[in-house]
Amino acid sequence: MTESTFPQYPRLVLSKGREKSLLRRHPWVFSGAVSRLEGKANLGETIDIVDHQGKWLARGAWSPASQIRARVWTFDKTESIDIAFFTRRLRQAQQWRDWLAKKDGLDSYRLIAGESDGLPGVTIDRFGHFLVLQLLSAGAEYQRAALISALQTCYPDCAIYDRSDVAVRKKEGMALTQGPVTGELPPALLPIEEHGMKLLVDIQGGHKTGYYLDQRDSRLVTRRYVENQRVLNCFSYTGGFAVSALMGGCRQVVSVDTSQDALDIARQNVELNQLDLSKAEFVRDDVFKLLRAYREHGEKFDVIIMDPPKFVENKSQLMGACRGYKDINMLAIQLLNPGGILLTFSCSGLMTSDLFQKIIADAAIDAGRDVQFIEQFRQAADHPVIATYPEGLYLKGFACRVM
């Protein structure tokens, strides 16, 4: 196809000097970088992005109501955004995941990790033969039909289920959607396998796409610290860490969550793996309140797993989130026996590893304890981070020895 035969897209013109991030292949254009839009573009429609002199930079999706005015589909001027484009992106992602699944014996993994797989705003998780789709940006929603067609080409034997029922869609003027797209409806609880564990996943009603695949490697690492130990599993959700701790030979694991439904599934997961249910306790409570109550009653643990939900959605919330992370980690440190292990995580993208480490250090000072950092964690390998988009590294964690 010659350049003259390409579709003529509306042009997003950047202000002078605001093209530097695109020249470094960062996939976002913020509102402050925009000079004007030449031509008419509907929400999510494909546009060309040019500098102030009209030089072509990238091709992306238009979102006039978002702070991120455009998300880049491609830096290749010869690529049209069509079914063939999405098929190529899926094949690229599929190659890595197929190798990883074979190497690690996985039946469930993240197939598409948004910007890091060249598909901004697109999240796809595979659970067995179900593909769970989340479209988080206007461009992704606009290309829904093309993306689904490409998925059917690459994964003809898989059913597709939509979980685009996340609040972030409202920021770009989109309604929340959920339901079957192709194939049969997922069962109420779908069994998957992870590092020797059998785990039940609620695709239709669970958090995100049903399960936190990004913590797969951290759950496995937990086993090295828990033998004959008393473990506190905070924000336990459906008990992945609890099952792993029991498989690692812990003396007891106490799982805490505010959701009774999640705790019920956690209990079923322990039973499904034929583990000793008498070693597992399930507590429905607010973690902050319970930790304070434990402190008042002199409760002690040997290992504490701290895997809270995202505390910060935007920069204005960062300071408050820092206080929350500091408070909860201080409480955990106070509850640990000397030589105890704190496995603590943050899934907030705006929280850098350096800042998170400083927060833990400050929490240790407030707790009056010395802490050694002994291991660092990140999201599993099916959640890659492309070099030009460091924001893709959202999950970070530390193993800390509390003196």
Curated annotation (Swiss-Prot):
Sequence ranges assigned to domain PUA in this UniProt record: 9-88
Keyword S-adenosyl-L-methionine: yes
EC number from the UniProt entry: 2.1.1.191
Coiled coil: none
Enzyme class: transferase
Catalytic activity line of the entry: cytidine(1962) in 23S rRNA + S-adenosyl-L-methionine = 5-methylcytidine(1962) in 23S rRNA + S-adenosyl-L-homocysteine + H(+)
InterPro entries registered for this protein in UniProt: PUA, PUA-like_sf, PUA_sf, RLMI, RlmI-like_PUA, SAM-dep_methyl-trfase, SAM-dependent_MTases_sf
Pfam families cross-referenced by the UniProt entry: Methyltrans_SAM, PUA_3
Sample GO molecular function, one term: rRNA (cytosine) methyltransferase activity
Keyword RNA-binding found: yes
Subcellular location: Cytoplasm
Record-level GO cellular component terms: cytoplasm
Keyword line: Cytoplasm, Methyltransferase, RNA-binding, rRNA processing, S-adenosyl-L-methionine, Transferase
PROSITE patterns: PUA
Function text: Specifically methylates the cytosine at position 1962 (m5C1962) of 23S rRNA.
The family this protein is said to belong to: Belongs to the methyltransferase superfamily. RlmI family.
Name of the protein in question: Ribosomal RNA large subunit methyltransferase I
